[in-house]
């Protein structure tokens, strides 16, 4: 039984984002809607909006990432956005950082079931992963306010890497509160981007910080 069928605008968006790998995305969503709820990774009320609010909202940021980049997803939880990116972009090398064992176990099971050879799951707190992992891009969604997030993500970046933080309406306010820290880390550019306009009913807001 398919718990979360695709229809209408979501179908069009999913086909455009995932292309021939859409069946993998659908299988991932089924994992979210079943074992993801049973094991406490996502709330049952989210099932009707898994595609638009979570999976498409996350996957659409793939257009911001260069081909062949290494990506670390901090506080990956249910794989949002990490697994979405791994499915949409098999050229990327993903490392999912998650401290909780039950979430790590679930992520590993889903990665194995989907046959995602471009994903590694790493059990750790982000701040403890510095030195153990590094990447061209770090992603984060619903982890912490930006002012705290930069401390646990920017040190993971390799050279002139970038942080892609998925944010909401508070993005501009959070950036303003983080300016001193960004100067401390030598950030070259900070911008607030809107991704998925014309494709999603609610486009995704991303704070991009480039070192």
Question: Where are the regions that the model predicts?
Answer:
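Class I SAM-dependent transferase core
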Residues: 1-72, 88, 102-105, 109-122
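Conserved beta-strand/loop positions that form the S-adenosyl-L-methionine
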Residues: 74-76
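Conserved SAM-binding loop of SAM-dependent methyltransferases across substrates and taxa
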Residues: 78-91
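Helix-to-beta-strand junctions that scaffold the AdoMet/dcAdoMet cofactor pocket
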Residues: 89, 157-159
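Conserved SAM-binding motif I beta-strand of class I
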Residues: 93-98
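Conserved SAM/SAH-binding loop
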Residues: 123-128, 143-144
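A short acidic, Gly/Pro-enriched loop at the edge of an enzyme's catalytic core
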Residues: 127-137
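Active-site capping/gating segments
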Residues: 169-211
